[in-house]
Amino acid sequence: MEQSKRVSMMREKFEAQSNEAESSPPPNRKPPPPNKRVQTNGTSSLNSSGSSFVSPSPSPSPSPQQPVKRPLPSPGVNKQAPPALPTQPRPQQQQPEIPVRPTTPTRTPPNLINSNGTSGGSGFSSSSGNSGYSSSNNNNSNSNSSINMNGNHSNGLNGGSSNPVPMRKVSSPINIANGTTPPPPPQPTPSQQPQQSPSSASHNNTQHNIPSPPPLPNNKPKKLAPTAVPAGLGSIIGGPKTPAISPGSTSPSLGSSNGNIPISTTSTPITPTPPISVPLATSPNNSHKDSISNSNSNNNNNNNNNNNNNSSNATTSPPSPPVSNVGNKQDEEKKGFLSIFTNKKKNKDKKKEFSVGSPFNVKHNIHVNYHSVTGFEGLPKEWEVILQSSGITREDVVEHSEVVIDVLDFHMQQQQQQAQQEQQALMQKQMQQSGIPAHMLNNPKPPTIPIRDANKQPHNQLQPTPHQPPQHHHQQQPPQQHHHQQQQQQHNNNNNNNNNNNNNNNNQQSAQQQSAGILSQQQEQQLEEMMCGGAYDDEQYDLNNQPLPDETNVSLYDLVSQEDPTKLFGEGSTKIGEGAAGEVFVVTQLKTNNKVAIKKMPLNQQNMKLIVTEIGIMKSCRHQNIIDYIDSYLVGDSLWVAMEFMGGGCLTEILEQFNSVKLVEAQIAYVCAETLKGLAYIHSQHRIHRDIKSDNILLGSDGSVKLADFGYAAQLTKSKQKRVTIVGTPYWMAPELIRGQNYDRKVDIWSLGIMAMEMAESEPPYMSFPPLRALFLITTKGIPDLKDQNKWSDDFKDFVKKCLDKDVENRPEAKVLLNHPFLKTACNSNGLVPAIMEAKKAKEAHSKFSIH
């Protein structure tokens, strides 16, 4: 009686749950395809994954009405129907793990037979449309329900059979009973997998201790038509792929009216395991963290059915395996969390790697081409603006496109050099603040230049002049002997062996200094003899007598003096000029009480090579038309170059006062002749000045003319008999130099012709044009004639014309021009003194006027 009451109570609760489930909206997820199974009675069914397999079912326990026990079915024998009312739970048998592959179902599961012998609805149909599995026939729900040995109820696909059905991934139910949350489910071990109760019908029994009667024996389940689909099959939830069933597990139970899928777990067929509870989600917003729900409708359905679960004390199903999306999200969250530290680490590494240093091997290659239709290609916008502002017309571009490209290339290089100099100046200021010399940081190994003599000389020893006639070598034996002795002493000093009379280091140093002083004096005497009488004959400047030198490297420290310049010169100094290379001061030499010009140049990686070149050439050149080099000194992060002081200033100072002081042809011829003598001398040494202009022609108070500023000078060698580097001042540059073609010493002759026109007209041609336009005109149009042709003689005009010949082969050498008729009209040095004095007076008057 008590059992029948419980059955009736169970039926009433089931009907109430079914009615409540009918009011909820149908789910929008599809069920997993059923798995096809081969039953023992010869019929086949489908599991939830759609794969066909044969699974033995555990033998049912004998019921009280039928004391005779049924034998356990085998895979090859047809199963017998279980008794109507089993008196004890049936033992379960562990099933081997069978991989399940989801496929599309081709037919529906067979109809099940209820206890009355009539065919009930499909176990998948749901009359309420809820996410659970309720019976389509509520009247037969009790007869079709089965109770496992743990007291859990479950629904099955086959009446009376205990074949396992693979687990389906669904959302775990939400249980809000008494506001408590069950503990998280324990993780099953490989030896103990969650067991699932066998299913019998589409009835959901809410009691735990009352077994449901099995279907009538010997009733063969009917099959659905191939095209028939159980009601509500399309609304069943469609989860991810069904995982493989591990050994010892059974099929999940189906058919809970409220959408829950209670699962009972047993580790062995004899010893039952307690039901597994699931962590609950108290809010639909957080349900994606605690459950495997994929839609808001499932969350709502779970929340609506919590009370039914609590009232029936039904055990909740364990959570299904995690969805891949959740794992991906967790990986992304983990990756994003870890990326915070990795990004910080990268930023720290970047900060550590960042250091202020001097640029090296700076290149800024811009390839510009010209198309007749589209115009310039590859030209930056800023260069387009410069090209438009330079005054170069479109007709000029079309007619001389290659020349325009060469001119732009030169202008780009000039801009790059200027930017590099500004960057070096900024770095120099930073190094001055740190108290470290710039040349020590930027240039641990100073650049070298090719010089004539391979033997390194001390700082106070001059290089032997390369243009010595052969007879002087035979006459001047003592310098050669002293030179050999000094080399031997240097070799002995390096090997710590003293071959002289003195055996101590002090005597060695004094002997070396004494021999160096004797050599210096004798070389000076030799140079004076060479520059006196016959110094300008053709043999002296004959290039055929001077072979090309080999390239020999020398560093800056081999050229500078180790003495303290503050002890050699007076404290008082007067600034007389300032240029791009540095500032020029006038000081008094304490030893001779003569005025000396000191050029203070900051050292950086950009100008180091130019400085070394300038010092090397000035130190090895001794000529009356070249500025006398005294010595150079390293002071902090700058280089002091001491040279001869020229009281008359530069030639530009006279040309600036053109309104009050105008040079005549005799004076112009004198300056040109003296300049040509200096050029012929350096050309005989296979050197190029490359920056001949009025700013680099220094004048003495006595009217002497000397070349200065060898910063752009170049040494021609056997490996470099011509140069292609584009350097110089735009208005004085030769066309072949502008275009970067192979050029030689004749570029200095072109610059001399421009300087001659500058002395006649106070400025070089195209001075009123922008530099880019001037370069273009020099290359394409050449140099125009003198403005006032009647004012100048034919010899002067011919001299200028020969110097400015665009054909390099027809342009004469310096030694040839020295014999030009125009130079024979030159005055002496005294004839230039009045112009120098008048220019100084005009400059002083102008400065006083500007102050007041």
From Swiss-Prot:
Cystine bridges: none
Major localization class: membrane
Binding site for ATP: 576-584, 599
Protein name: Serine/threonine-protein kinase pakB
Catalytic activity: L-seryl-[protein] + ATP = O-phospho-L-seryl-[protein] + ADP + H(+); L-threonyl-[protein] + ATP = O-phospho-L-threonyl-[protein] + ADP + H(+)
Family indicated by similarity: Belongs to the protein kinase superfamily. STE Ser/Thr protein kinase family. STE20 subfamily.
One of the protein's GO biological processes: protein localization to cell leading edge
Annotated CRIB domain residues: 356-369
Entry superkingdom: Eukaryota
PTM characteristics: Autophosphorylated at Ser-8. This may stimulate interaction with GTP-bound Rac family members which then further stimulates autophosphorylation and kinase activity.
EC number assigned by the record: 2.7.11.1
GO MF terms held by the record: actin filament binding; ATP binding; calmodulin binding; metal ion binding; myosin heavy chain kinase activity; phospholipid binding; protein serine kinase activity; protein serine/threonine kinase activity
Top-tier EC class: transferase
Domain Protein kinase: 570-823
Basic residues: bias regions: 470-485
Compositional bias per record (Low complexity), positions renumbered to this chain: 44-56, 90-117, 124-163, 246-270, 293-317, 419-433, 486-514
Biased composition range(s): Pro residues: 24-35, 57-74, 181-191
One Pfam short name: PBD
Gene3D superfamilies recorded: CRIB domain (3.90.810.10), Phosphorylase Kinase, domain 1 (3.30.200.20), Transferase(Phosphotransferase) domain 1 (1.10.510.10)
PROSITE patterns per UniProt: CRIB, PROTEIN_KINASE_DOM
SMART domains per UniProt: PBD, S_TKc
Keyword set, alphabetical order: ATP-binding, Cytoplasm, Cytoskeleton, Kinase, Magnesium, Membrane, Metal-binding, Nucleotide-binding, Phagocytosis, Phosphoprotein, Serine/threonine-protein kinase, Transferase
